[in-house]
Amino acid sequence: MKKLLLIAATSATILSSSISFAVDMGNDWYLRIDAGAAMFNKEKDKATGVKLKSNTTVPVDLGIGYYISENFRADLTLGTIIGGKLKKSGAATNAPFTGTNISASHKPTITRLLINGYVDLTNFDMFDVFAGAGVGPALVKEKITYNGITGLSSNTKNRTNISYKLTLGTSAQIADGVKAELAYSWIDDGRTKSKNVIYQGTSVSTGGMRYQSHNLTAGIRFDI
């Protein structure tokens, strides 16, 4: 948590410098909110070898940003996910569970703070097309549940990772000072902590799941 606060303070300082520059140039700043649907990449459960698939999760982001120039803007966003899981039922392939029919579920908790930059690639009368990238700290942990194996379920503690985000989207002005966005983003939030669980006298490694996601979101920007 201390690492996240330290990085957050550094991020805020960098954004503050951008704010001062933007104010000096007479440019506006804005608030934003985004939500949508996301799917995690397929991963393999470390303990059992079962290949996991994602359900649909809801990403939510709130942020504040500044128009640095006519075609470039930057913002600071705080984001999380709602309801995401990697899960699958099947026969385990890893010892000592080989052949056992199990159901595995990994439910992550992800909180990320990103500094993002966006460049307008084209400017049409009705809409703009933009590309962007973001980086910042993410707190990642997960709840691991097994049905069919007793005593293996566990929770991992928070791990501070560096999160990366790539975005391609379009925006259109829908009212004076209000723009709507539709965007695709790829996000890598890194891995959770690994944890050893004692199962019938044997140490079994769980956790260590990597969370990468494909996101389709709609958002609103309000000029202030």
Swiss-Prot record:
Entry GO CC: cell outer membrane
Keywords linked to the UniProt accession: Signal
Name of this chain's protein: Putative adhesin RF_1314
Keyword 4Fe-4S among UniProt keywords: no
Region forming the signal peptide: 1-22
Species of origin: Rickettsia felis (strain ATCC VR-1525 / URRWXCal2)
Domain of life per record: Bacteria
Coiled coil region boundaries: none
